[in-house]
Every structure is written in C-alpha cells, then in structure tokens.
C-alpha cells in the first residue's frame, strides 16, 4: 500500500503570528528581529510585504532598512510561537497520531490510515482551511508518497497552497528543479555538485553511485535515493521521543571576540549550560564539536573525540578550547561561538580506562565540578564561578541558543 504523507509548513511563522496578534501591522512590511544591543540584530523572519522589498532572513537590520525604509521592526515573542505551534499540532492530531515536528513551524503527517477522511489532497486542504479559520495563520502543504517529496511540495507553492507530487509523475514535476531544493542538499553539497555540472534534481538522480560516494560519501548515495523517490523513513508518532544525538549551546556576543582569552571565557560559560543538559538527559560526552562564525559571517566547524566520556564542564571547556586554538587562524574577529557535546553515552555506561589514564585526577575534577554545580543550584549560578569570568564579559545577558539535537530521520 502506497503511503500518503503530508508536510505542513506554517508560512512566515514568526512574522505571521506577530501580524495576527497586532492587526495594525496588516499590509505593512514587517520583520521580526533580535536585540540590536545584544548583537542579535538580524532578521529572524519577515512577512511577504517585506519580502517584496528584498528583505532576507539572516541579514542585519540596517541592511533590511536600506531595502525598505518603512520596515516595521518587532521583537520576537517565543511564548506565542510555542503556543500557536501547539495549537496547529492539535489540529493535525484530528487526522492522525503520526505527527513528526521538523522545527517549530513544520510537521510531517502520515495519513495513510485516514482514508475515510478523504484523499491526501482533501485532508491537506481541510487542514489548511481549518488552520486559517481557527488560528488566523496560513500553511503550505505538500502531499506525496514519502517525506522528502512531501517537504519539497510544501516549498513549491507559497503561501496558503497545496502541491501534490505523485509516484507516477514526480520525474516530470521535480527533476527540472535545482538540486538545492532537495532536503539533504545544503550549500556545501550544492557547491560540490555544481562544480561537476550537476545542477538539477534529475541530473543528481542520474549520477553514478561511485562518483557520488567518492565526492560526498554516504550522504551522496542518500541524496541520490531521495532524487529517485526512494525514501521509506517513517513519520514518528506524536508521542515518540527521539534519542538525543548532541547537546550544545551557542551564542552571538555583544562585541566581536578578538583574542583567545575572550574565546576561553565564552566557552567556559557555554559548557556550564551543556553540563546541566547532559545531567538532565543522563548523558556523557564522547566528543566535542565547535562552530565559529567570524565577523564576515563565515562559519568553520571542527570536532574531536574525548578519550573518556565525561560531563565535566572543565574538561569539556579545555577540549573545546584546545580544538579552537589548534585550528583558528585569527584572520577575522569572531561573531559567534557554539559548543556541542557529541558521541553521547549513557550516564551509567561502563568506562574502559587505559594504562595512561590519570583516573585520580579525572575523578577529582568531576567531584569538584559536581560540588560547584550543587552550590550554584542552591545559591544561584553566580554564587561561584571561574575567576576569569569576573572580568567584563562580552556575553549577552539574555538568550542563548539551546541545541538539543535528536537523531534525524535523514541519512
């Protein structure tokens, strides 16, 4: 039996919620932006009126203002976005319990067993009309026989539209589209493909396995399967909890970081949050990954393994900083830093030590970190901290970016 998969994408979600809650913003160009003072002064979302002026997500506010002098800037209200995201999922739940979120504003739905409610298109259209009537928001929906093409369909027509991609006609409909439109083909992959003259989904579908594996590894074989409609990944049930794959924190600093000492201070603060999340999820880090974005907005990433899985923020910070110092060349000041704990192990997993492991030192450090955490829990996070953190910090006082990543359905 062929599956019927929907992908529902709430159009310009943040901006649409703001405009719905503030009717005076209707028909005005609106951009939801972070705090200018704390260097989150970029466009997080924009409505279609702003898009018509060329305003782009991710650009600085001053750049957006140059394109549209009448642009209305509003601050994000995340509690409202969470509320409306939940309300939308409650509507989806009227049709199936197989609902898999893909971010706050997107979901896959498997309605294969909901045939009594209509065809895939009919169900998608009813959901679209219900969300519009009950929530005042619009969605675009893709209807297909797998998750990859359902997602592609929801991107093809916006806003407030439905696109069907059928098994017997998908080649004619999507093989002419840019390869970058396919989920799993990011900017780096697109650049590699285009360098070899592979520009469309159809060209990707016809490329040899050996060539793709040589140039892109396992991901190359995966995206070729997607291009040929070969995706059998399931839509998870609404109550399914994905295993955690990595835990991290990232921050955009109030001022650019200009030396190793400033980066060290930032990493020390970030790993304290990571430690808390590791404890919450009962995990230990078996590796560290860092992502560094410079003031030219170019990002570099590195990762390494940790010989002994740990929750120690001190050990995590030292490992992250060592990785940074070894690789970053200081060609430009740094705008943002992200640290992630990867290769996670269960908290109570048995540990195999080698002959060269300083077990006493490691145990002493972990007990010290645990004592510090208890003091912070009882008296507040500023009750005790590293001496270098008492100097003037470039860390913003408000929002850090939590990165708790479940295992993905792709790859």
Question: Model segments located where?
Answer:
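Gly/Gly-Pro- and Ser/Thr-rich, intrinsically disordered tail segments characteristic of DNA damage-repair
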Residues: 1-225, 235-238, 276, 359-411
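DNA-contacting surface of Y-family translesion DNA polymerases
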Residues: 7, 189-333
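Short, charged/polar surface micro-motifs in flexible loops or helix N-caps
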Residues: 13, 36-39, 295-298, 344-347
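Short small-residue beta-strand/loop micro-motif enriched in glycine and branched aliphatics
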Residues: 72-73, 298-302, 349-350
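Short Gly/Ser/Thr- and Asp/Glu-enriched loop/turn motifs at secondary-structure junctions
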Residues: 102-106, 144-147, 283-287, 332-336
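Short, hydrophobic beta-strand segments
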Residues: 107-113, 301-304, 352-357
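Residues at or immediately flanking beta-strands
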Residues: 138-140, 289, 336-338
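C-terminal hydrophobic structural anchor segments
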Residues: 315, 321-378
